[in-house]
Amino acid sequence: MTDTLFERSDIDALLAGRHPDPFACLGPHGQTGQVVVRAVLPGAKSVHALSPEGAELGTLACVDRAGCFAGTIPRNGGAPHYLLAIDWPDARQVIDDAYAFGTLLDDAVLARFSAGDPAAVLDCLGATPARIDDTDGVRFAVWAPNAQRVSVVGDFNGWDGRRHPMRLRRPSGVWELFVPGIGAGECYKYELRAADGRVLPHKSDPCARATEAPPRTASVVADVAALDAFAWHDEGWMHARPRADRYRVPWSIYEVHAESWQRVPEEMNRSATWDELAERLIPYVQGMGFTHVEFMPIAEYPFGGSWGYQPVAQFAPSARFGPVDGFARFVDRAHAAGIGVLVDWVPAHFPDDPHGLAQFDGTALYEHADPREGLHPDWHTCVFNVGRTEVGAFLAASALAWARRYHVDGIRVDAVASMLYRDYSRAEGEWVPNVHGGRENLESVAFLRMLNDTLHGAAAPAGVVTVAEESTAWPGVTAPTGDGGLGFDFKWNMGWMHDTLAYVREDPVHRRYHHDRMTFGLVYAFSERFVLPLSHDEVVHGKGSLVAKMPGDAWQRLATLRAYFGFMWAHPGKKLLFMGSEFAQWAEFAHDATPHWDLLDAPAHRGVQRLVRDLNRTYAAEPALHALDCHAAGFSWLIGDDRDNSVFAFARRDEAGHLVVAICNFTPVPRASYRVGLPAPGQWRELMNTDAAPYGGTNAGNDGAVWAEAVPAHGEAWSALLRLPPLATLWLRPA
């Protein structure tokens, strides 16, 4: 009898975790006048079928001591609704049968996924609490086209891959299963058997919306409905965002490593939670006059020393900072304070942690199979195969999810240069040319265009900004995709950063020989739309902090940094400054330590902080300093060739004719009567002086104002004699 209820071949295949189609034998299967019910429940003592009201419908006999059960129940017309009453050694469990449910995902959404629609990834993959046929549970779906078998495992089944093998939906390669009786908060992973028969290490869900806190590695079922129904209060912000001309408004970005911005030393040096960061970071950013906060990657990452740049869960805010809805609360409060939120996002590569994406289904699924394409030589990580339709859709869906679910205002795309060149950091013979024999990565170009079109299109909330960290001269990074560009809104100006930092590192007596480093950036300043980045990358790995790069004694170093900040904030391009630099921290960035806030007890460091605050406020208040950041009409040199005195002067303007003139003296020698051409006659007010006493300077200057007289100089009809403070920048504005 039992042989007819449960075929031996099915029993053996299920217990070995090799059955190609568990739904073909498990669950209810009709026979004349009755229904055969089969279940695999290793460790169960007995199993009974009950009606929803609790009446016994039949007993499932143990047909194999390893945990296979089968029995019959009455048909009673249509397909019966039954429950399984499972007697475990220590308790009875009454649940719906996972194998009594039909297919879950619509064929159309699976077709969209296979065609590369990022929105389809959000619609079908991951773990989603659901109610199906009046039964609550979780719908699991994962892409693993080359696996022989996929099971979902978790606390709910003792992490036993025999309990919940999934259904393969051909031809999409997506596996699905509805597990009744569980919900948000459950830990889970996937157990996969590769095509060659290997059982792989348990894998986290690539599309998990939540995770355990490291070093634990399980995915966590998120309350998706609650996240989607989050009570946002930023309607005004979201409505106004696309209506602001992002290129004409001030951008001053405070770059933050969320894990270390303000640790809690009395609690084992833990990171602050999102709610704690909202209480402390948002008022700080607002008070300092920054317009945006940019987080180094916050998608879950196993290794803290990667600073987030080796993520394993592209859709999940790291559990280091508390529940995922805490990040939504942070963004909501930031918007209420008038602060935009950007996140660093990593589509170039991923770590090879065994629970992650590497060899996900036993094959190079997310990465390239050829190590000349699939292994990154600098970071020893796996390179995403963005040319594969489903992988490109997966990544773009991640960016889309941050914009949709968490209202982030933009993403900064990491390591774009490494994606664009097939020979990036590779020697001859270690890379594969493209189809035309060249070094350009055509698949990455297509992916980046698709990404930007997605985030700038109807699928995303209006007004999302994309920023490229691209360190080469690749043309058209910020040009529209329709014109052959990559479609980014802004690009980090790495050349400007390298050149100008190299200049200020020089002893003042030698700066005359490196004068062009400060002026060369204007040759190409308007070829792209730029952000001027003084980022975390410049204050790690032995490079020294910004102030530590400067030569001279402590006073000269601080003065040079102040002068450099004055030059930067007046220079065309949006601004970015890494945490700790705003008060001239001496130490390099350390991910396991907090910035040295105690330095603010010293007047000199408070002065630098006050300067950055005032630079931000003045930059935002003066349209001349930001409205034409991306247009050559907004800039003109007044003095660009006085290398002997290491003096620079230039004018910034907007379309309405507002003017600001910046004059920089990068020597410790005060200039008592230095003539500077000015674009307008009359009184010019001293708008900014980085040598002012409140900033820690000597208070040398021009008593608040100068008069432009009809003496031609530097191509202008008017000029003024100025006192230039040592190692300082002045800003002047017509009174």
UniProtKB/Swiss-Prot annotation:
Enzyme class (EC, first level): transferase
Domain of life, per lineage: Bacteria
Function description: Catalyzes the formation of the alpha-1,6-glucosidic linkages in glycogen by scission of a 1,4-alpha-linked oligosaccharide from growing alpha-1,4-glucan chains and the subsequent attachment of the oligosaccharide to the alpha-1,6 position.
Name this protein carries in UniProt: 1,4-alpha-glucan branching enzyme GlgB
GO MF: 1,4-alpha-glucan branching enzyme activity; cation binding; hydrolase activity, hydrolyzing O-glycosyl compounds
Pathway: Glycan biosynthesis; glycogen biosynthesis
Catalyzed reaction equations: Transfers a segment of a (1->4)-alpha-D-glucan chain to a primary hydroxy group in a similar glucan chain
Positions of the catalytic residues: D414, E469
GO cellular component, one term: cytosol
Signal sequence annotation: none
Gene3D superfamilies: Glycosidases, Golgi alpha-mannosidase II, Immunoglobulins
Record EC number: 2.4.1.18
Family matches, as InterPro entries: A-amylase/branching_C (IPR006048), Branching_enzy (IPR037439), GlgB (IPR006407), GlgB_N (IPR054169), GlgB_N_E_set_prok (IPR044143), Glyco_hydro_13_cat_dom (IPR006047), Glyco_hydro_13_N (IPR004193), Glyco_hydro_b (IPR013780)
Pfam families: Alpha-amylase_C, CBM_48, GlgB_N
Subunit relationships: Monomer.
Keyword vocabulary terms for this entry: Carbohydrate metabolism, Glycogen biosynthesis, Glycogen metabolism, Glycosyltransferase, Transferase
Gene Ontology BP terms: glycogen biosynthetic process
Similarity comment: family membership: Belongs to the glycosyl hydrolase 13 family. GlgB subfamily.
Coiled-coil residue windows: none
